[in-house]
Amino acid sequence: MRRLLVLLLCLGGCGAQAAEQGVKVISPQRLPLEGGQLALGLSQDWRQPLPGVERALIIVHGRLRNAQTYLHSGQSAAGQAGQSTTTLVIAPQFLNQSDIARHQLPDALLRWKGNGWMAGEPSVSPQAISSYAVLDAILQRLEDRKRFPALKEVVIAGHSGGAQVVQRYALSTGSHPELEKAGIGLRYVIANPSSYAYFDAWRPVAFEPASCPGFNDWKYGLNQLPAYAGGHSPAQLEQGYVTRDITYLLGQQDTDPNHPALDKSCAAETQGAYRLIRGHNYFDYLVRRHPQGLLQRLVEVPGVGHDGDRMFTSPEGQAAVFK
């Protein structure tokens, strides 16, 4: 009975406790960035030319910052799709200060405050670099035709907290003309995030705005935009976002309104009770605002709840990433 109680308690809180104590595994590779270094995992050594790589999959971890777990999920998905040799999987790791302390990591490694990396906040040391600018830097490296002469497309995918990163990045990033010039496509796969950034004050759940004063602030809305957005107006950001090629990948069983990792803030609750309905509400909102020409789609994954590995290795996940 005591063991059962410990297990039940752990389901509710051990993940968060582990995250506060620092991530277990630090990714082994490094990407130099403006006087600092990003920790990341790679499925192939990109320090040398990779003439056989046709697709790069940038896969973003969730709040536990377990980048190596997501790297392995990406590799498994590529293997099941028969595309291991032609796919470079890249898993950036957004460390925080507890990770640095736990592993006694060097000062050069970039780290963020708490979960601020999800919203594009700048790193706190050794340089102030937005987590979204990190994705820009990875894309910039992939533009190099000497290293990647056969690259055809880049897919940026994330699950849970990582999906929040991908959704907000797709919204706040500008165009990538060098990718376009090189003939390299860019797609996004957003899997089971807790929340989305809306374009205006409308929300699918009725509420009293006075009781939730930050409901329309970034990262839930477009008030108080981050510096990374570069002074663009909400209208400009929306117009850019709806031109992106995006797949919203939702687990049909991700329906627990009390899931321990679900965002239960009032700003998130205005979007729906659980992740599946929040995703449907947001996609319906997009279609109403842009009934013509939307290059986006919603795909449900049967029998899967809040599980990143099962989402990306499912037939629907493989089709979204490797179509």
Where are these regions (language model features)?
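Conserved alpha/beta-hydrolase
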Residues: S84-D99
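Active-site glycine-rich loops that stabilize anionic/oxyanionic intermediates
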Residues: H61-R65, S194
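Cap/lid segment of the alpha/beta-hydrolase catalytic domain
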Residues: L95-I129, A261
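A domain-start/cap signature at the N-terminus of enzymes
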Residues: A16-A56, L64, Q68-L88, G116-A133, ...
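Conserved acidic catalytic loop of the alpha/beta-hydrolase fold
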Residues: Y132-K152
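C-terminal catalytic histidine-bearing segment of alpha/beta-hydrolase fold enzymes
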Residues: L249, H280-K323
